[in-house]
């Protein structure tokens, strides 16, 4: 199988030093910023509706995460996503705990109407977003990634690419599907690691607008491999976080491509 796109997508991302506009949750700001900086991207957190729609026009990509959702934040998210879509700026939706409350479900329905380029969630979130039965407990997924494959396909009517993250990540654009076997369980023991992945995917698709699915696959390989490298040294979640950032900083395109464990299903 040809994985030559990994190096080209990686280089495009690094060369662009993408400015990623993040409308993310309160818990995630620091980690999202640190991850993007370690990857040579530029983070921005501009939330207020008075300036966020204007600021996104200066950005290469937008990441929206509904983790700590309020009506005020939702209004800003909707206005900013609408602007991004109108300007052709790729944006990624992270529907955190969408199945937990009616407010989140309604918010995501509104956001889906603005046509995100990528949706990124765990299996339970993807199932709930597609209107299928899920077994989530808050932000934690109680479903397997395989159980969400059909839901991911259904959501391609709203987004160009759907990413389901879990033990084995899954990416679909409605025509091709990729399974990515990277990462480490320690990633679940540090808050906002998933939120930061959403931001990284946004940066990758912003730099690879004509190959968004491949860009998402590359981001997942890069991120998961960084976690694996970090756990060769780390002793627990604290040291993992430090070594994870260092690994993101150090990994090169050839490393990510040569170590990639990806299966393509056409």
From Swiss-Prot:
GO terms for biological process: thiamine biosynthetic process; thiamine diphosphate biosynthetic process. The keyword Transferase applies. One of its GO terms (molecular function) is hydroxymethylpyrimidine kinase activity. It catalyses: 5-(2-hydroxyethyl)-4-methylthiazole + ATP = 4-methyl-5-(2-phosphooxyethyl)-thiazole + ADP + H(+). Its cofactor is Mg(2+). Substrate binds at residues 45, 192. Catalyzes the phosphorylation of the hydroxyl group of 4-methyl-5-beta-hydroxyethylthiazole (THZ). This is Hydroxyethylthiazole kinase. It comes from Psychrobacter sp. (strain PRwf-1).
């Amino acid at each position: 199988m040809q994985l030559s796109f990994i190096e080209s997508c990686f280089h495009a991302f690094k060369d662009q030093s993408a400015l990623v506009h993040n409308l993310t949750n309160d818990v995630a700001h620091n980690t999202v910023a640190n991850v993007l900086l370690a990857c040579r991207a530029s983070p921005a957190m501009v939330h207020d509706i008075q300036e966020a729609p204007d600021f996104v026009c200066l950005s290469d990509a937008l990441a929206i995460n509904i983790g700590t959702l309020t009506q005020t934040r939702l209004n800003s998210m909707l206005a900013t996503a609408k602007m991004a879509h109108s300007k052709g700026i790729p944006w990624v939706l992270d529907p955190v705990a969408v199945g937990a409350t009616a407010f989140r479900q309604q918010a995501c329905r509104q956001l889906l109407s603005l046509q995100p380029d990528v949706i990124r969630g765990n299996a339970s979130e993807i199932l709930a977003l597609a209107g299928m039965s899920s077994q989530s407990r808050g932000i934690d997924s109680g479903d397997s990634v395989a159980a969400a494959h059909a839901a991911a396909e259904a959501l391609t009517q709203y987004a160009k690419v759907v990413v389901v993250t879990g033990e084995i990540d899954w990416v679909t654009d409605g025509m091709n599907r990729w399974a990515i076997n990277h990462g480490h369980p320690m990633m679940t023991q540090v808050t906002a690691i998933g939120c930061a992945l959403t931001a990284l995917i946004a940066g990758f698709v912003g730099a690879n607008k004509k190959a968004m699915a491949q860009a998402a696959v590359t981001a997942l390989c890069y991120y998961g491999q960084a976690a694996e490298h970090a756990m060769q040294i780390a002793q627990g979640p604290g040291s993992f976080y430090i070594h994870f950032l260092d690994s993101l900083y150090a990994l090169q395109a050839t490393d990510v491509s040569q170590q990639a464990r990806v299966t393509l299903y056409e």
